[in-house]
Regions:
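Hydrophobic alpha-helical transmembrane segments
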Residues: 1-89, 97, 101-103, 115-141
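Membrane-interface alpha-helices at helix entry/exit sites of multi-pass transporters
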Residues: 105-111
């Protein structure tokens, strides 16, 4: 069984597909991707990231950040949320493989979480660089 065959089997709930059905329609690919996003949105940390994004957008409108600053914020939103989805996927796969304590399982989960943390810290620093001068000007300080 090839990797593609096993992916089709997993996505179809183990029912398998005919050998003649070799090309998955594009909308099915998008549906699976949106299912993954919805799964991720159920995670506590993703909810926190979404709340922070809403706050940044609100402050962005209030403080009238520039187009370039909007672009930076949007790229950072996408990066953090994508990393959070990858982190969720890695955690799910590790949990699928073992529920016992294993050093490699811990390393996989911790490393994925660390990637999200680094991106989040850098996004927060970038946000401070963008928003602090505008907040000071807004309050005439």
């Amino acid at each position: 069984m090839t990797e593609t065959d096993s992916r089709k089997s997993v996505r179809s709930g183990g029912r398998g597909k005919k050998d003649t059905d070799t090309v998955q329609p594009l909308f099915d690919s998008f549906r699976h991707a949106f299912d993954g996003i919805l799964t991720g949105l159920g995670e506590r940390n993703m909810k926190i990231h979404c709340l922070m994004a809403v706050l940044v957008v609100a402050f962005g409108f209030i403080l009238r950040i520039s187009i370039m600053e909007w672009c930076i914020c949007l790229v950072l939103f996408g990066l953090i949320m994508a990393l959070e989805l990858v982190n969720t996927a890695i955690e799910a796969v590790v949990d699928l493989v073992t529920h016992e304590y294993r050093p490699l399982a811990k390393a996989a989960k911790d490393t994925a979480a660390g990637a999200v943390l680094i991106a989040s810290i850098m996004a927060a620093i970038t946000g401070l660089i963008i928003f602090i001068p505008r907040l000071l000007a807004f309050f005439h300080l």
